[in-house]
A protein has these predicted regions:
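Glycine-rich cofactor/substrate-binding loops
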Residues: 18-54, 115-116, 297-494
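A helix-coil-helix interface module used to build multimeric assemblies
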Residues: 15-219, 224-231, 292-293, 304, ...
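Short amphipathic alpha-helical segments with heptad-repeat character
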Residues: 135, 139-146, 150, 157, ...
Length: 494
């Protein structure tokens, strides 16, 4: 009788007349106005592969532990495979009344295979289920971003090889500072993105522990084998505390932070592309494929896509802050606020995948205007530091040398010329330490070649650095290749 009573009231009528899976305790359905408001299905349906993988692993473990029969486990696995294939093919209709991806799949499974589908949720709560789905999703998203990161770094390294003899002004405060190799400049970004790869891997690792078995918050009385489930899903281990398992979203914050730093690096690079492609700089010419025009000004060729990448950094930062603010006041354990944790992560990952791809395309198709860069090296007194070093190496304290050269620069400003344009007699009047070989200190290629310290811009130093960058890239590709048993994101729910 109790069994029949449970079956009779297992479902609860929802606002649309259909049934909710959690309805045994309720006498009335949800208000119609809350149906869409409370549903997460439009977002978490994108985790359908993760949800199905988690359910298959859970059912397999239940059968291994003798909690459900082998026949039920087989029916569940086959039913879930059929649902996944239908979603992949775009032949599955998601119903907002199912509330979330878990109920959507479970209700369809029960419709297809009957009684066995109702046993799937034994020993499991949606709390540990959604935490598992989300962790699997973060691993998949981090892996996708790591791959895009590697592709962009290949483009940067290839460009650094190509432009290893091109010199341009280096800037501080957006003022001419010292000359550097373009390859040196590009490798600076390569190292930034290399650090981003490390942060993405850290986010992957933070998500790489399984919450299944924590149930609602306190664990379960069923003899679950959590290690088996974790291994089936490719997790490194299990989360040791059931409260933490269902309420932790630090791993999502790690993904958001890694993504925010990537966005910041992309934005900085985009800003330079915008500047360099302007008429005032003319250092690069963007491909037509990565530019747009004006609806009124026929002459315009705008770096819209670099500007968009720069602009999208704010969007990515916003997603990080949104989750931080959501989490800051939540008591243990699960709270419905956590339903707001996935949309931002999916948006950040999608946004950055586009940005990384577009950036790689822009750099690989741009034209570097070496003449414009060389011409700009002839203004702004880029040799000033080396002239001061010239005096310091001949015994004059550097601070005094700094003052002498500062006076020479002021003289140039008043005359409207550059340091190399001053007659030798002017140098000798400024300091008797100047000799005819001062011309070497004024030669831009010689200045660059002299920067031989480790990490410097001299061609020899950059060649060493380039080798290190390639070695780091190869090592990170090995790390990427080791990321096995990741449940990849599905695209059938788009």
């Amino acid at each position: 009788m109790a069994h029949c009573f449970g079956r009779l009231f297992w479902y609860l009528e929802k606002g649309d007349g259909s049934m909710a899976l959690w309805g045994g305790r309720f006498e009335a359905g949800v208000a119609e106005v809350t149906q869409e408001f409370g549903a997460s299905l439009p977002i978490d349906k994108h985790l359908y592969k993760q949800d199905i993988a988690g359910s298959k692993a859970h059912a397999k473990m239940l059968a291994a532990q003798g909690i459900i029969s082998a026949e039920d486990e087989q029916a569940i696995a086959e039913g879930l495979t059929g649902i996944e294939q239908d979603i992949d093919a775009g032949n599955f209709t998601f119903d907002i009344n199912d509330e979330d991806i878990h109920m959507s799949i479970e209700s369809e499974l029960t419709r297809r295979i009957g009684e066995a589908g109702k046993r799937l949720h034994t020993g499991r709560s949606r709390n540990d289920q959604v935490a598992t789905d989300t962790r699997l999703g973060v691993k998949a998203l981090a892996k996708e971003l790591m791959e895009a990161n590697l592709q962009l770094r290949h483009v940067l390294v290839d460009a650094a090889k190509k432009y290893d003899k091109v010199i341009l002004p280096g800037y501080t405060h957006m003022q001419h500072a010292q000359p550097v190799l373009l390859s040196h400049h590009l490798l600076a970004y390569s190292w930034m993105f290399a650090r981003d790869f490390t942060r993405l891997k850290a986010a992957f690792d933070a998500a790489d522990n399984c919450p299944l078995g924590a149930a609602a918050l306190a664990g379960t009385s069923y003899p679950l084998d959590r290690q088996m489930t974790a291994a089936e899903l490719g997790f490194a281990g299990v989360i040791p505390n059931s409260l933490d398992a269902v309420s932790d979203r630090d791993f999502l914050l790690d993904l958001h932070y890694a993504g925010s730093v990537i966005a910041m690096h992309l934005s900085r690079l985009s800003e330079e592309i915008v500047l360099w492609s302007s008429s005032e700089f003319g250092f690069i010419t963007l491909s037509d494929s990565y530019s747009t025009g004006s609806s009124i000004m026929p002459q315009k060729k705008n770096p819209d896509f670099a500007e968009l990448i720069r602009g999208k950094s704010g969007r990515v930062y916003g997603n990080l802050v949104q989750l931080l603010v959501t989490m800051k006041g939540l008591p243990l354990a699960y709270n419905k606020d956590l339903q707001e944790d996935k949309e931002g992560a999916l948006d950040t990952a999608h946004t950055l995948m586009q940005c990384l791809s577009v950036m790689a395309g822009m750099i690989s198709t741009w034209t570097v205007n070496e003449g414009a860069m060389a011409c700009e090296c002839g203004v702004g007194h880029l040799a000033a530091t080396d002239v001061a070093d010239y005096l310091a190496k001949r015994g004059l304290p550097f601070r005094e040398a700094h003052a002498v050269v500062g006076h020479l620069v002021l003289m140039c400003e008043k005359r409207g010329c550059n340091l190399e344009d001053l007659p030798f007699e002017v140098f000798q009047e400024a300091s008797p330490l100047f000799e005819r070989d001062i011309t070497e200190a004024l030669d831009i290629p010689s200045i660059v070649a002299a920067r031989t310290t480790e990490g410097g811009t001299a061609p020899a130093a950059v060649a060493v650095q380039l080798g290190r960058a390639e070695a780091q890239l190869a090592a990170d590709e090995d790390v990427f290749g080791s990321l096995t048993k990741v449940v990849e994101m599905g695209h059938g729910a788009n």
